């Protein structure tokens, strides 16, 4: 990633140089005037440009038009700005403007670049039956580099959600034929939690209760049409920042800090509530309990850092092998569990034995060289008992695998 900074103040340039190096660590080119900036723009591709509005040889903001003409996102720095200039800049399509007041202003500019970097990977679905409104929202989002997908009504939006993965934000109008914004949100919330997707409602109606009704139905925020550019961007950024924070909290609570697979807490909270239904419907459900053979010897011989590398790689192989269809969790230490919903013990045994053989045949690469690692596994399937009892039976089978020589899969009888 390469950034262009156009600023005639050496003090401001030094501050930005320091902050960018500290926060972004990317390549930065500096220009003091319009002439030198044009030369740099002609010879490099830039991710974003941070430009002073008034330069010694271009007092009317010509640099902004030059940057935007080359389809480079532009963040404008200025010592002063009246309402007409502000409106003109926003209509040109800049990312944002920042008044040069103190160090916080420059920190904000650098944070904005980081947000743009993140936004490249954020998918946003816009549902609105008005082509004009939809295209306007799309243009605002694309100024901040979001990936934008359009739907012309609620039913089309549901079709998109069925086919597109990783949509993080839904922006939906209220009045739409077929399925309105409220109905769309209710259906979306049946499938996606607040940790998985954020929703912003839009409407031009004068009904003052709309904002509360949107939020009660499951939206994160509401915006009344017509809205100004800045309010829209602030609402979107705040909503996505909140989504990121909620996700981080959820991950801290439910993912293992080292291996990033699920933890014991998540495993029990997910499957304990399901167990009575699985028993009543006689749905097949099995668990495999895995233990890395002689893991203490790895730590004693090579040190705990190498031991951590082995745990991380072992967990990644489990995720690659099972994670698409089944749940992988770390129970603690070198012990992991795989939950096989829909599989009986015999089928789970077959898959786990294949994983065991693959692991034994493929050494784990560490910073201290390759290590031959094997695993012992115990399998048990649900027979009307509790989750604790099911795990205990898998643990007994795991003990049998160890006692029988390790690098084995044993199934609970």
What are these regions (language model features)?
Residues 55, 176:
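Receiver (REC) domain active-site loop signature in two-component systems and cognate sites
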Residues 250-269, 290-304, 312:
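Conserved nucleotide-binding and Mg2+-coordinating catalytic segments in signaling enzymes
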Residues 327-330, 371:
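A short pre-motif secondary-structure segment
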Residues 291, 295, 314, 331, ...:
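Hydrophobic framework residues that shape the active-site pocket
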Residues 270-302, 318, 329:
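Active-site-proximal structural segments of metal-dependent nucleotidyl cyclase/transferase enzymes
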Residues 349, 353, 367, 380-413:
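Catalytic-core segments of nucleotide cyclases and related cyclic-nucleotide turnover enzymes
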Residues 306-327, 335:
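Active-site-proximal alpha-helical element of nucleotidyl cyclase-like catalytic domains
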């Amino acid at each position: 990633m390469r950034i262009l900074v156009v600023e005639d103040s050496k003090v401001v340039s030094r501050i930005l140089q320091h902050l960018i190096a500290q926060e972004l660590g990317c390549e930065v080119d500096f220009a003091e005037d319009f002439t030198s900036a044009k030369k740099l723009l002609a010879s490099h591709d830039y991710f974003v440009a941070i430009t002073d509005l008034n330069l010694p040889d271009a007092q009317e903001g010509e640099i902004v038009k030059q940057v935007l003409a080359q389809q480079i996102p532009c963040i404008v720095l200025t010592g002063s700005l009246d309402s007409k200039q502000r409106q003109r800049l926003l209509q040109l399509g800049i990312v944002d403007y920042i008044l040069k007041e103190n160090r916080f202003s420059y920190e904000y500019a650098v944070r904005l670049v980081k947000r743009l970097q993140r936004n490249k990977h954020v998918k946003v679905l816009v549902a609105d039956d008005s082509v004009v409104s939809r295209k306007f929202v799309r243009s605002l989002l694309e100024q901040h580099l979001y990936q934008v997908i359009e739907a012309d009504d609620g039913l089309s939006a549901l079709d998109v959600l069925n086919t597109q993965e990783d949509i993080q934000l839904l922006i939906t109008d209220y009045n739409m034929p077929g399925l309105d914004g409220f109905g769309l949100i209710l259906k979306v919330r049946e499938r996606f939690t607040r940790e998985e997707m954020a929703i912003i409602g839009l409407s031009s109606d004068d009904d003052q209760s709309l904002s509360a009704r949107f939020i009660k139905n499951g939206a994160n925020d509401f915006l009344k049409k017509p809205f100004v550019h800045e309010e829209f961007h602030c609402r979107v950024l705040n909503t996505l920042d909140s989504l990121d924070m909620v996700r981080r909290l959820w991950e801290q609570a439910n993912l293992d800090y080292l291996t990033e697979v699920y933890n014991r807490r998540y495993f029990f909270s997910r499957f304990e509530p399901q167990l009575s239904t699985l028993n009543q419907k006689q749905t097949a459900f099995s668990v495999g309990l895995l233990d890395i053979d002689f893991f203490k010897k790895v730590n004693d011989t090579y040190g705990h850092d190498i031991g951590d590398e082995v745990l991380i790689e072992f967990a990644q192989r489990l995720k690659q092998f099972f994670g698409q269809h089944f749940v992988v969790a770390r129970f603690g230490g070198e012990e992991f569990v795989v939950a096989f919903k829909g599989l009986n013990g015999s089928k789970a045994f077959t898959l786990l034995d294949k994983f065991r053989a693959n692991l034994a045949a493929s050494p784990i690469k560490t910073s201290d060289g390759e290590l031959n690692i094997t695993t012992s596994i115990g399998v048990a399937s649900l027979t009307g008992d509790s989750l604790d009892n099911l795990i205990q039976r898998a643990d007994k089978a795991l003990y049998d695998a160890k006692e029988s020589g390790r690098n084995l899969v044993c199934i609970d009888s």
